């Protein structure tokens, strides 16, 4: 399980951040709140929530990133 990913922000949209850490680019789904918090930054740390969807051939592993632990905790309560 990942606690956070820290690295260079290489791509950013209001819904997705790509963070390069140790030569790997992680595509991380983000909230608009996180987008506002990291916009304009070169290096970021995103607190991660992992989601695994198992559906036969459509299995997926999705990362959700948050600028703060508090925002991640709130998301997990939903």
Regions from the PLM with identified roles:
Residues 1-5:
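Short coil-to-beta-strand transition motifs
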């Amino acid at each position: 399980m990942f606690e956070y990913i820290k690295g260079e922000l290489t791509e950013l949209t209001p819904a997705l951040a790509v963070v390069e850490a140790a030569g790997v680019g992680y595509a991380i789904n983000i909230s608009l709140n996180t987008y506002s918090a990291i916009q304009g930054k070169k290096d970021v740390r995103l607190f991660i929530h992992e989601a695994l969807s198992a559906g036969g051939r459509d299995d997926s592993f999705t990362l959700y990133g948050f600028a703060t632990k508090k925002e991640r905790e709130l998301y997990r309560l939903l």
